[in-house]
Structure formats: C-alpha cells, structure tokens
Amino acid sequence: MLITFEGIDGAGKSTQVAKLVAYLKQQSTPLLSLREPGGTPTAESIRSLLLDNRKSITPIAELLLFSASRAELVETLIRPALAEGKTVILDRFFDSTTAYQGHGRGISLEQLHSIIALSTGDLLPDVTFYLDLEPEEALRRAFSRSGLPLDFAAQSNESDRMEQAGIAFYHKVRNGYLTLMQQHPSRFVALDATQPPDTLHQHIIAEVETRLKLHISPLVAP
C-alpha cells in the first residue's frame, strides 16, 4: 500500500508522517518511509543540488531534477518495497509537482503529466492525505516555529523562503491541490490542518486502518 502526504509548506505533513510511522511500527506493520526529493544516494545528491541553487534554478530545471530524483526513488526503493508487501509512506510525491511546478510556477500541465508518467511508471498512491491550510496561517507558523524538520527548500529559513515566493504563489499552489482533490476524490483525503496534531493523527489512523483492510481483503478472501 502506498500512502502519500501533501500540502503547502507549513501545513504539518512531516509531523503527521512521523506520527503515522510510529503508530504503524507499534502495530508491527512492515513499512518504508521516504521523503521527496531524497531516499537514495543519487536522489540525496539531487536534493542537495536543489537546495544549494534554490534562488537561481529555473522552473524547468527544477522540474526535471525533481523528476530524476523521483524516477530513481520509484525504481530502486518504492516498487521493490511494495512488491515485498510493505506499506510505503511518502512525504510528498508527484502531486507536489502538479501543485508547485504546474499551478504555482505555471508550467504546462500537459507537459507535467507526461514527465510525471515517465518518472513514476504510472505508479499511483492508494491514498493521499492532503493537509489543507491557508497560506497566511502557514507563514505565521513558519515565523513562530523553530528547530523542527522543515519541508523541502526550507532547511535554512522557511519563513524567508515563503516570503520570497510570496503569498500569491502559495495561494496558487493551494488552489492546485484543491483542484487535484476534486479530480481524484477517491484517492484524496482532505484534512483541516488547523486542527490539533493529535486530532489529525486519529483521523489519519482511522482512514489508514480502513484502507489497509480493503487493500489486503482480496488476498485473504476465500
């Protein structure tokens, strides 16, 4: 089963990923937890390249580097783990590309879809948890938060990065996510990210347990 987490920077994805991983480990669920970009030596090198050049890299170059990292991750780690029956949890996947590079940066969605299909081999998540948050609240959190794991490109200073991109950019990204949610209602589970983290965690656990039962039921049916 492939589980992905999506949302704008500051929505709390990484916190919920960590909580779900801890819970599933307690349940002795075989799993693999990964982030994008990263996870393999090649992908981590690409991550470093993106971080080091986040102010100067062009949107197309950014897209292709993300896609190269994703292709490596899918083929070397994700597909083998799924074949072994593991639950794979991803902090971001290709929906981030559609929301950020497509809706946010204005790259053609038709071009994006072709590149995404190539980099993933048409691999789809079984469920995508989307943590919805207004950009203004996300920026407020970025200013108030200190010493916690940050989303991609935020390792040095998340609030500076969000200010540089601009609130308008994050509204475009959020609208992109809302569009994706409407287009794929059976895959997306929308969560109000203003709720307390533990409340969100309980909602996520309930959904994951339900979907895990449905996911394995064909294997155990008489």
UniProtKB/Swiss-Prot annotation:
Q: Which reaction does it catalyse?
A: dTMP + ATP = dTDP + ADP
Q: Which GO terms describe its biological process?
A: dTDP biosynthetic process; dTTP biosynthetic process; dUDP biosynthetic process
Q: What is its EC number?
A: 2.7.4.9
Q: Which PROSITE patterns match?
A: THYMIDYLATE_KINASE (PS01331)
UniProt-listed InterPro entries: P-loop_NTPase, Thymidylate_kin-like_dom, Thymidylate_kin_CS, Thymidylate_kinase
An example of a Gene Ontology cellular component annotation for this protein is:
cytosol
Q: State if Transferase is listed as a keyword.
A: yes
Entry annotated with the keyword Phosphoprotein:
no
Please provide the record's keywords in A-Z order: ATP-binding, Kinase, Nucleotide biosynthesis, Nucleotide-binding, Transferase
Q: Which SUPFAM superfamilies match?
A: P-loop containing nucleoside triphosphate hydrolases
**Positions bound to ATP:** 7-14
Molecular function (GO) terms for this protein are: ATP binding; dTMP kinase activity
Which protein family is it in?
Belongs to the thymidylate kinase family.
What is the role of this chain?
Phosphorylation of dTMP to form dTDP in both de novo and salvage pathways of dTTP synthesis.
Instruction: Spell out the protein name for this chain.
Output: Thymidylate kinase
Species name: Chlorobium chlorochromatii (strain CaD3)
Read off the lineage from the record. Answer: Bacteria, Pseudomonadati, Chlorobiota, Chlorobiia, Chlorobiales
Gene that specifies this protein: tmk
